[in-house]
Regions:
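Beta-strand/loop edge motif enriched in small/polar residues
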Residues: 2-233
């Protein structure tokens, strides 16, 4: 598969009906907002085994949009060789200056899942800033076959960590479905080997002001639905 063109607005390469996202997601117009639309399917990829995309602005995902991931090895077709440039990546990283607003609807949910040629993926990893307020929202979203540990380690399909006592973090998860049944079956894993649905870790005892609201959501074939870890050290 050869790239047809570069879409500067999305920092990605366009393969027919797939948008291969391999560079940082940043706003080109100064608005600090990038929108992903349902008429495209986005594949999170590493480039040449080195670069992988990170969210560095507010990413708004439109209802009905699909975002695909992979194991980090093999191309879009799942075949690995030395000539592969773009490999579906298992982790979607949200940096300190980024956030995600994924508001689907009952009729048009947003889907985060593995591309069919890869058995699974890890999760969305959110790093909190040292100060200021940040909000991440997931409504009517499907998280399918995540929670594996490919290329790197994540604790959950939504994995939040760091921040300080000067950080205010808001997380809304509503009417979301977390289901890794096919991953557990196809890779012969125990559910204890899969990450949590939503994980929050304050490892350094930073006492982040966290407002986390999880409602009307289901969790299936995961080590646990919701997990939180704090430290006073």
């Amino acid at each position: 598969i050869m790239p047809q063109n570069i879409t500067a607005e999305d920092n990605s390469v366009n393969y027919d009906n797939l948008i291969i996202v391999s560079d940082d997601i940043v706003s080109e117009d100064g608005s600090n907002v990038v929108r992903w639309t349902k008429d495209k399917t986005y594949v999170i990829c590493s480039k040449n085994m080195v670069n992988r995309p990170t969210v560095k602005c507010k990413l708004i995902i439109e209802p009905g949009t699909t975002i695909l991931f992979g194991t980090g090895t093999g191309n879009i077709d799942g075949i690995e060789n030395s000539e592969v440039v773009y490999r579906p990546y298992p982790i979607f990283i949200v940096e300190e200056d980024g956030s995600i607003e994924a508001k689907g609807t009952k009729e048009k949910p947003i889907t985060f899942k593995n591309i069919d040629t890869h058995v699974g993926w890890n999760g969305i990893e959110i790093f909190l800033p040292d100060n200021g307020e940040v909000t991440d929202t997931f409504e009517y979203c499907n998280f399918i076959n995540g929670g594996a540990q490919y290329r790197d380690f994540t604790e959950g399909l939504i994995d939040v960590s760091y921040g300080t006592e000067e950080t205010k973090f808001n997380l809304v998860v509503d009417h979301c479905n977390f289901d890794s049944t096919e991953l557990v079956k196809n890779v012969d894993l125990q559910t204890s080997e899969i990450g949590a649905g939503v994980y929050y870790g304050d490892y350094d005892g930073n006492k982040v002001e966290a407002n986390i609201k999880i409602s009307n959501s289901t969790f299936k074939s995961l080590s646990m639905g919701i997990e939180g870890v704090t430290s006073d050290d």
